[in-house]
UniProtKB/Swiss-Prot annotation:
One of its GO terms (cellular component) is cell outer membrane. It is found in: Cell outer membrane. It comes from Xanthomonas campestris pv. campestris (strain ATCC 33913 / DSM 3586 / NCPPB 528 / LMG 568 / P 25). One of its GO terms (biological process) is protein insertion into membrane. Keywords: Cell outer membrane, Lipoprotein, Membrane, Palmitate, Signal. SUPFAM superfamilies: Quinoprotein alcohol dehydrogenase-like. A lipid is attached at C24 (S-diacylglycerol cysteine). This is Outer membrane protein assembly factor BamB. It is a lipid-anchor. Part of the outer membrane protein assembly complex, which is involved in assembly and insertion of beta-barrel proteins into the outer membrane. PANTHER family: CELL SURFACE PROTEIN (PTHR34512), OUTER MEMBRANE PROTEIN ASSEMBLY FACTOR BAMB (PTHR34512:SF30). InterPro entries: BamB (IPR017687), PQQ_b-propeller_rpt (IPR018391), PQQ_rpt_dom (IPR002372), Quinoprotein_ADH-like_sf (IPR011047), WD40/YVTN_repeat-like_dom_sf (IPR015943).
Amino acid sequence: MMKQVDMYKRVALIALMGMSLAGCSTVKGWFAGKDAAAKKAQEPAELVKFEPSVKVDKLWSTGVGKGEGHIGVRQRPAVADGKVYAAAITGGVQALDLQTGKRVWEYKPKKEERNDRKFKQRLSGGPGVGEGLVVIGTLSGDVIALNQADGTEKWRAKVPNEVIAAPAIAQSLVLVRSNDGRVSAFDAATGERRWFHAEEGPTLSVRGNAPIVTGPGVVFVGNDVGTLSALALQDGRPLWEQAIGVPEGRTELERMSDVDGAPVLDGTTLYATSFKNETLALEGPSGRPLWTRDHGGAGGPGVSSSVVVVADNAGSVWGLDKSSGAAMWSQAALARRSLTGVAIQGDYAVVGDYKGYLHWLKLSDGALAARARAGRDTLLAQPLVVDGILLVQNTDGDITAFRLAQ
């Protein structure tokens, strides 16, 4: 009888162990399912199918050298007088015909010497173009001015830190923002430094600097502390400073509020965005805010005659009323695709993404209108539209031109 009882105990114990293991398996599967769902929710949105409402033609594509890769400087070309001026990290500077992409001239920088060794100069900031000059900055803090007509070197200057934003040229001055927050002004004819203005930066900031924007007698500078500053063009005197994104939060990461996208000066009104998902419209002469909205991101805004379009850090694109900032529409189909700043081409807003795709959205309602791919490499730089042609540069150093079909 005792043996029979022991046998029943063993059977019961085995049954309990089996139930316990089955329960563990069920709980584990439940958590695994939640983890998979959470992971999928963080993945870039898959591209949705839609019926294009506009046709986009690819005009040309060309490489200008080895691109920025993961350096994160968001290089893009500049355009003047029917020519595209472009640079790559180790590829020099090229002038291309805007309509055909054919090379007009090419500049190869001399190798720099350090500790009795020669290294290729890495061209990172710009180029900027104006007043007969093409100006580029380097990761070593060199500023190189070229003749716009033939690419010959005219002068060199030095700044104390790497240059990762395009220089600006205005009223016989070359204006350079270095990564330490300093703005330096050089004589456009000689390269002699005229003035500089230093801005204190935060402990932690987003990689990238906003290009300098100039107005009549004024220099507008986006800062890593989340402000936009106005300086007097001729001597660098501070005129005003306005917060775009307030650096709030418990950690340095939460407080990041950089203004890294190119501000847009439209008439006398400035439009700027910050990493804090803020967009602000303000008076250029006084810095007085006109409106602010909790939609925006690290990339620059696109401004049309009636709509300000911004892409936020989550990958949603917003259309804001130009006069009031009220949200007119939003488009979430590109969520988490690491969108660029916004360009305006005709009746469409255009953004690029991490897979090299460009997306055209209707300005009227934000609906997807067209899609094209500018190669397989990441697009970080804000697209540029000149004379109806959209230009975009990817991280591999390729530039591609698109036009809306007539």
